[in-house]
Regions:
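N-terminal subdomain of nucleotide-sugar transferases
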Residues: 1-39
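Conserved nucleotide-sugar phosphate-binding/catalytic loop shared by glycosyltransferases and other
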Residues: 5-7, 33-79
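Short N-terminal targeting/anchoring amphipathic segment
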Residues: 75-95
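A short, histidine- and acid-enriched strand-loop-helix "catalytic/donor-clamping" loop
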Residues: 112-126
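A conserved, positively charged/aromatic
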Residues: 122-136
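Conserved small/polar residues in nucleotide/adenosyl-binding loops
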Residues: 145-152
C-alpha cells in the first residue's frame, strides 16, 4: 500500500515513525511519502518536506510566514493528488492537517485517518464537526477525546 503521512512537529515525527515501522512489519511492501522528520526518514520512504520548515509558533511568526504556510499547504495537496496514496494519515498538527483532511475528503476518494487526534478544547468545539465530516478513522491516544468526538461534547 501507499501511505501519505503528515506531521508538523518533533513529537509527531516520533509517533509517526513508530507507526510506520509497525505498518512496515505488517505490510513489507509499504511505500511511504511524507511531510515529516528525521525519525520517519530513518524508517524509509520519501520525505517531501521536513516539519521544521512547517512549524511556526506564535501570532507574529505565523503572520510573517503566511505565504510560506499557504505554499506548503498547496504543495502538500498537489503532492497527494499527484501521488494518489491508498490512505492519508494525519498526525496531530490540527491547524494544517484539518485543512488537508477537508481537501482530501472533498476532492479525492482517498481515505483519511487521523492518528493522535487534535485536542478538542471548549473553544475549538467546531473541530468535532470537521473531524466527523472529513476524517474516515480517528485514532486517539487519549480516551477522553474519543468519547467527546462521539457525542459532540467539548473537552474542557
Amino acid at each position: 500500500m501507499k501511505y501519505y503521512l503528515i506531521v508538523g512537529e518533533a513529537s509527531g515525527d516520533l509517533h509517526a515513525s513508530h507507526l510506520m515501522a509497525a505498518l512496515k512489519a505488517e505490510d513489507p511492501q509499504a511505500d511511504f511519502r511524507f511531510f515529516g522528520g528525521d525519525l520517519m526518514a530513518a524508517v524509509g520512504g520519501t520525505m517531501v518536506k521536513h516539519y521544521k520548515e512547517l512549524a511556526y509558533m506564535g501570532f507574529i511568526p505565523v503572520l510573517l510566514h503566511l505565504r510560506t504556510i499557504f505554499a506548503n499547504m498547496k504543495r502538500c495537496k498537489g503532492d497527494i493528488v499527484s501521488w494518489q496514496p491508498d490512505v492519508v494519515i494525519l498526525v496531530d498538527y490540527p491547524g494544517f492537517n484539518l485543512d488537508i483532511a477537508k481537501f482530501v475528503h472533498a476532492k479525492t476518494q482517498i481515505p483519511v485517518y487521523y492518528y493522535i487526534s487534535p485536542k478538542i478544547w471548549a473553544w475549538k468545539e467546531h473541530r468535532i464537526r470537521n473531524i466527523k465530516r472529513d476524517v474516515d478513522e480517528l485514532f486517539s491516544i487519549c480516551l477522553l477525546y474519543t468519547s467527546d468526538a462521539a457525542d459532540d461534547t467539548p473537552c474542557v
